[in-house]
From Swiss-Prot:
InterPro entries, per database record: Vesicle_transport_protein_Use1 (IPR019150)
Protein origin, superkingdom: Eukaryota
Name of protein: Vesicle transport protein USE1
Membrane protein topology class: Single-pass type IV membrane protein
One of the GO BP terms on file: endoplasmic reticulum tubular network organization
Main subcellular localisation: endoplasmic reticulum
Subcellular location: Endoplasmic reticulum membrane
Keyword list, A-Z: Coiled coil, Endoplasmic reticulum, ER-Golgi transport, Membrane, Protein transport, Transmembrane, Transmembrane helix, Transport
Subunit record text: Component of a SNARE complex consisting of STX18, USE1L, BNIP1/SEC20L and SEC22B. Interacts directly with STX18.
Pfam families: Use1 (PF09753)
Transmembrane stretches, start-end: 232-252
PANTHER family: USE1-LIKE PROTEIN, VESICLE TRANSPORT PROTEIN USE1
Cytoplasmic side: 1-231
Amino acid sequence: MAASRLELNLVRLLSRCEAMAAEKRDPDEWRLEKYVGALEDMLQALKVHASKPASEVINEYSWKVDFLKGMLQAEKLTSSSEKALANQFLAPGRVPTTARERVPATKTVHLQSRARYTSEMRSELLGTDSAEPEMDVRKRTGVAGSQPVSEKQLAAELDLVLQRHQNLQEKLAEEMLGLARSLKTNTLAAQSVIKKDNQTLSHSLKMADQNLEKLKTESERLEQHTQKSVNWLLWAMLIIVCFIFISMILFIRIMPKLK
C-alpha cells in the first residue's frame, strides 16, 4: 500500500530531526524540541488515519520518536554521569528511516551521545582534579608543593567514577527486578483468585442445571399425576351417569305396573 501524505511528511520531519540530533547544537537551540513535539502530534494522527501503515512500521516510528524525546531529556540533566545513565536506557530504531541510510540514524546518534557523555565525564574528572586546593594535592601525592596528579591516579579515580556508575546501574536493575517479581506475584495471586471464582461459577452453573433437571422431572410427574386424577374423575362421572340413566329407565318401566 502506498504511503499517505501524512506518513511522507512524518518521514521527512523524522529524517530532519535525526540529522539535527547528529549535529553539534548550541545549548539555546530550540528547533529540535519543537520538531519532536510536531512528530508526536503527527504520529498520533497517523495511528488513527484511514490509510495507516502496518503496526510494525508504526512501532518503529514510535521507537524513534521516543528515542529523540529521551535524548532531549537526557541533555537537560546537569551531571554527565546522569546523562550517560539516561543514554544507556534509550532504545534507537532498528530500521533506517530513508533508503539512503545504511545504518539507522538514531543508532549513530546513540553512539555519538554515548561517546560525548563519556568524554564529558572524563573532562569533569580532570577539571575537578586540576582545581583542587594545594593541601589536598599534597595529601594525595605525599610530597610538598603543588604537583600534577599522575595518570595512574587519574585512571584510578576515573575507574572509581565508572564503578559508582555501574553500582547505580546494578541498583536500578535490582529495583526493576524486584518490581518485576512483585508484579509476577500479584499476577499469580490474581490468577488464583480468578481461577477460584471460575470454579465457584462452574459449580453454581452445574448445580443450577441439576436443579433445573429435577424441576423438570417433578413437573412431568405432577402432570402425569394430574392427568391420572382427571381420568379417574371422568370415569367415575360416566359410571354415575350410566347408573342414573339405567335407574331412570327401570323406574319408568316399573311405575306403570304399580298402577
